[in-house]
Amino acid sequence: DSYDELVQHQGEELESIRKYLMPGKLLILERPLVIAHIYTKLCEAEEKQIHIHADLSCSLENIDVPDIFLIEIIGNLLDNAIDEVAVRGRYEKIRIAIMDDGNEICISVGNEHEKILYKEYRMFFEEGYSRKGNRRGVGLPYVKKIVDKFHGRIEVGNIMYEADNYFVVSIYFKR
């Protein structure tokens, strides 16, 4: 009986890897620590029945941001998206994209969400502001400090994908 359970568990793990094409799809990023961290977050989302669409089309080697800070940025954005989707229940999709437009690398994370007004989402980067309750509101201000330190920029907004609204945070760094 335990052998059959082991085989079933291995099959489920292999299906999980195949489903996300991991780590193969992430290898384009060329930063092993960042790859491992993103993979962990994708597995966490999968465990919560959250669907993630990943559009990873470039290396992160061309930006001068140390791995630890990329992990902080991407981890925070994914944590926020996963938390928001898990709490709301009716939304179940997250998108992550890492792209190169020739001048900048864009790291973008969004989750399915009702539209958020500009006057509110600009407050997300203020220390202590949170829609999640007390003792929160430190992650995005920290992300902003990192982005500023490495001369990047942040854009936030509502974007439509396949007729669904997503709240998206995009971080840009010069190549």
Which role fits each region the language model picked out?
Residues 87, 152-153:
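Conserved glycine-rich
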Residues 91-103:
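Short beta-strand/loop element within the Bergerat-fold HATPase_c
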Residues 26, 52-73:
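Conserved short strand/loop->alpha-helix "switch" segment adjacent to the catalytic nucleotide/phosphoryl-transfer site
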Residues 147-151:
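Detector for a conserved hydrophobic position within an alpha-helical segment of the HATPase_c
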Residues 133-146:
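Glycine-rich phosphate-binding loop
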Residues 105-135:
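Glycine-rich/acidic phosphate-handling loop/turn and adjacent ATP-lid/helix
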Residues 45, 81-90:
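A short, flexible helix-to-loop-to-beta junction within the catalytic ATP-binding CA
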Residues 12, 27-48:
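Short beta-to-alpha transition helix within the HATPase_c
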